[in-house]
Amino acid sequence: MGWDLTVKMLAGNEFQVSLSSSMSVSELKAQITQKIGVHAFQQRLAVHPSGVALQDRVPLASQGLGPGSTVLLVVDKCDEPLSILVRNNKGRSSTYEVRLTQTVAHLKQQVSGLEGVQDDLFWLTFEGKPLEDQLPLGEYGLKPLSTVFMNLRLRGGGTEPGGRS
């Protein structure tokens, strides 16, 4: 069954999102991203008025939300730079200052400049997952001193994980 949830921001503005009881916080955050353009990793949600933080991957109904409910949205600007490590194919790690709102493509440009390898000749992975150029770094849960791996593309038409050439 579908219902509307009120999302209230600290500045006082409110908006509605359509949900179902089986939806999780991750799905709610995706709806909020579509509505106001704030990435999911920047969203902190809490039940109004209790202030209890919502748990990711838990159905909204299990957290006491239903028709007529309101959640508070706090947006983390993620302005502070953080240092991460990028390990190249020779096993050497270099430190990079990044912001979580930067895209993977921006980090690849930085790595390309330092490593002397064109950015279309490598891809980056974190915790075994390939990083998508168009996504912000914050979508991957990077923390200070996280290690990202640089993977060189093989000559001769090899493909990277995900089937891209």
UniProtKB/Swiss-Prot annotation:
The modification S-nitrosocysteine is found at C78. The record marks R153 as: Interacts with activating enzyme. Pfam families: ubiquitin. The keyword Lipoprotein does not apply. Residues 2-78, 79-157 form the Ubiquitin-like domain. SMART domains: UBQ (SM00213). Its main location: cytoplasm. A motif (LRLRGG) lies at residues 152-157. Induction: Strongly induced upon exposure to type I interferons, viruses, LPS, and other stresses, including certain genotoxic stresses. Residues 158-165 form a propeptide. Residues 153-157 are annotated as: Involved in the ligation of specific target proteins. One of its GO terms (cellular component) is extracellular region. Changing R99A: Strongly reduces ISG15 signaling and abolishes interaction with ITGAL. It is found in: Cytoplasm; Secreted. One of its GO terms (biological process) is positive regulation of erythrocyte differentiation. Keywords: Antiviral defense, Cytoplasm, Disulfide bond, Host-virus interaction, Immunity, Innate immunity, Isopeptide bond, Repeat, S-nitrosylation, Secreted, Ubl conjugation pathway. There is a cross-link at G157 (Glycyl lysine isopeptide (Gly-Lys) (interchain with K-? in acceptor proteins)). PANTHER family: UBIQUILIN, UBIQUILIN-1. It is linked to Immunodeficiency 38, with basal ganglia calcification: A primary immunodeficiency predisposing individuals to severe clinical disease upon infection with weakly virulent mycobacteria, including Mycobacterium bovis Bacille Calmette-Guerin (BCG) vaccines. Patients are also susceptible to Salmonella and Mycobacterium tuberculosis infections. Affected individuals have intracranial calcification. Both the Ubiquitin-like 1 and Ubiquitin-like 2 domains are required for its efficient conjugation to cellular proteins. The two domains play different roles in the ISGylation pathway: Ubiquitin-like 2 domain is necessary for the first two steps allowing the linking of ISG15 to the E1 and E2 enzymes while Ubiquitin-like 1 domain is essential for the final, E3-mediated transfer of ISG15, from the E2 to the Lys of the target protein. Homodimer; disulfide-linked. Interacts with, and is conjugated to its targets by UBE1L (E1 enzyme) and UBE2E2 (E2 enzyme). Interacts with NEDD4. Interacts with PARP12; this interaction inhibits PINK1/Parkin-dependent mitophagy. (Microbial infection) Interacts with vaccinia virus protein E3. This is Ubiquitin-like protein ISG15.
